[in-house]
Each structure stands twice: as structure tokens, then as C-alpha cells.
Amino acid sequence: MSKAKCIMVQGTMSGAGKSLLCAALCRIFAQDGYRVVPFKSQNMALNSFVTRDGAEMGRAQVVQAQAAGVEPDVRMNPILLKPSSDVGSQVIVNGKARGQMSAADYFRMKRSLIPDILEAYNSLAEENDIIVIEGAGSPAEINLKADDIVNMGLAKLVDAPVLLAGDIDRGGVFAQLYGTVELLEPQERARIKGLIINKFRGDVEILRPGLAMLEEKTHLPVLGVVPYLRVEIEDEDSLSDRLDAKAAVKPLDIAILRLPHVSNFTDFIPLEQHPLLGVRYVQNTRQLGAPDLVILPGTKNTMDDLRWLRESGLEAAVLRLSAAGTPVLGVCGGYQMLGEQLCDPAGEESGTPCTLRGLGLLPTTTVFGTEKHLTQTAARAAAPFAGAALTGYEIHAGSTEVRGSAFCTLADGTPEGCVQGNVFGTYLHGLFDTGELTEKLTAFLCRQKGIDPAGAELIPMEQYRQQQFDLLADGVRAALDLPAIYAAMGMQKGDNT
């Protein structure tokens, strides 16, 4: 079996649209009949996923795998950094946590991870036709280039041709692309096979003179101008846009607390797509108002975010709303906060040993430890969502003692989470993806508010996701010079037949 061909997408900066371009290429190559997988050697993100075999990986490569029509595999993202503070992260290698590291300590040791990166990449290359590689940030961060393992450093290791993308929506795209190319070493510059203008709004003809000058100055072809595509696909780069977005006015108002270390906010994307549910993210009591449901999401630092909740006045506001009958849902770290007590005897979560009082809305006690619980599971929800089937995954380091009713029952019969009155808590991420729990929750909130939910039909999440991947692929396929991209990989479209 011949080894896979590859193409790498690098960007002029974070947020240039690399993740979605890679997802689009994965979909396009899959549509063209190739076995394709994504790859990113090192990802820094708070949003993560647990694979079927219990390994943790970044969600960007999960989305790209879904676009390619393959099951997420930790080899697609061998190194994941989950920031726990401004200067440190939890380092996850091959799906398992290696511990907390400062940025300085990680930079000193990261080249020792090259064998892990190459083992993951080479094993994928033996099983597939094409690997779509995503870079990180910019390849022209000259202070980081010496020990680079994710941009040109990786391209050299796997001999990858590179496409360089710039975001025109932010302005200055010609300077971005030209400056990036000029800051590269000659051998790095030689790897770039073409430039991509991303997120363009307007008439492409207006760009023609600029494109011609850019090609003349860089001696590189512009392989496409990709329009600003309005597709509903979760995107690591869209985090701030999504959290800042103004919620559409809909009959039911859901307020999600925007915790400082919020993680896996992607849990709630299915709620945003429901015709009756308006979802907004709030940071203070003024924004909170009087919603129909309050959600405490997951967090990478439960203890610090609980302190913030208390100091910001949001804890008191949530307690008042709950006392007045407003439903409250906590997921993972948010679930832990809703309990009576959180204990960190070894300082695993907060840096120093401590015990904090929770919100006291659920009869639970959480104790943090060193071992992280990673698993995929299926479950059936209990009242008031009785019968709803859900699938999800757990990523948490604490164990929680529950002195009350369960939120759901796992496939093996184990009770999970907690319910007390109108307060619900669960460790399950991805709980709304199947749609059944979303419908049960919507019906429950409608009853609470006296609204008739009739006529509000929800497209199944998986069907909707596939539609969006096809829309993305259609838009990018129409914009890019695909024959040139195939040629850059040493291929021709159709040579797999």
C-alpha cells in the first residue's frame, strides 16, 4: 500500500479560517472518492472530545473527521494543550494527560514529542489516501520558529506542500500574506504552493489588481478567493464570535454563564439551532436578566470559576432565580459548582489545597483527584425528561457523591448526575447532540412558561451537520483551484479509480 499524499493549510494568524478550510478539503476529497483524514500535531483549545477508546483530543479535528466521514481518532491530534491559566496548560499526549506545565517548561520539552507526532502521522498515512494537515497561528512567529512542531517545522518533517491562507474580513490581507512569505526562510517559502484569500465579501473583480500584484511580489499563485460562508459548523476560531453574538429573539430565553475558563461551549450549539430557543452568553448580573433557563457550562478550572461566580454577584443572582422557580442546569464543572461542597485536598484543581462551598442547589459533594475520567457513553434521561435517549462523553478529574435522584441512567445501569426540583446536573458533554433531550427540554420549558411548542420541528443534529458540511464544501470547491491543489500533492483528481 502506498503512503498517503498530504496538503497543509497554514494561516497568516490565528482566526484566518484554517480549521474550516481543512474541514472543507476533507469533505471535498471524501466526495471525490478518497480516504481522507485530518491531522494537527499540536492544538491549543479548551474544547475537547473523548474518542470511543477513551482518549482526549481537540474538537477541531473531530469536526474535520466528521466532514471526512470517518470516526475521530486521537492520532489526528496527538498533542492537546488545555490552558488552565494565562501562563500554563494541561499537556495531553496521545489522548492522556501528562500534567500541568508552564509555557516555558513546555517550550523546552516539546521537541521531545516529535516521535509521538511522527508515529501518529505515519500510522494514519499507511491507512489513507490523503492527509489534510492544519497548522497553528502563523508560520512567521519568528520567536517560536526554532522549535516549531506545528507549522513549517512539521511541514519539513512530513514533506508537506503548504497552502497559506489570509483573512480579508479583518483587513490588511495583502500585507498579511506578503509579510508572512517574506519572513520565511527560502526553503520554507519553497514549500508554499499557493495563497488563499479567505472570508471575502463583495465582488471578486475589485480584488483582481491586488491579486496580480500579490502574485508578482511573492512569485506565488493565488489559488482562490473563498467567500464569507455562513455555515453552522462549530469552529475553534469562532469561540469569541459565538460568545459575543446577540441572541436571536425567540420564545424561550436561555442564559449560559460565560465563565472565565469556559470549556466545551460546543455542547450548546444544538440549542442555538432550535426555532424556540434563544441562547445567549452572560458575564454579569445586568446581562443575566430573567431567563427561562440558566446553564452553568463546563470549565477548565472549576474552583477559580466558582470564586469568580461568587465575586461577580452571579451566584447570588442564580440562587434568587432558582428560588423563584427558574430551572438551572449544570454540565461537568457547572454541575460540580451546583453541589454543596467542592474539595481539592491535593491542590490538583486550584494549585493549593482548599475546600469551597458550592451553590448548594444539589445534594452533592465533589472531591478532585489526579486521575481524569474519560469515556463515551449512552444514557436515558430521568424525569422531567424521562425517556430521552442521549449520548455523550465525560472529561473530568473529580468524583461526585450524589445524595439524591439521578439525572440519567447510563447504558450499563449506573445512575449519573443529579436532579433536585428544577435543578439538574450531569457530567455528560454532547448531551444535546442526538436531539431527543433538546426536544424534552424544550417541551419542559414550554410547559413552565405556558407556550405551545406545536409546529417547531427540529432537524436531527447529524442530518443538519451533514447538510452544513456539504454547503461548506460546495462554497470552497467553487472558489479554489482544485486541480492545482491536487497537482501540489502530486495527484490528479480521479487517479484513485
Predicted regions and their residues:
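Short, Gly/Pro- and small/polar-rich lid/capping loops
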Residues: 4-9, 343, 356, 361
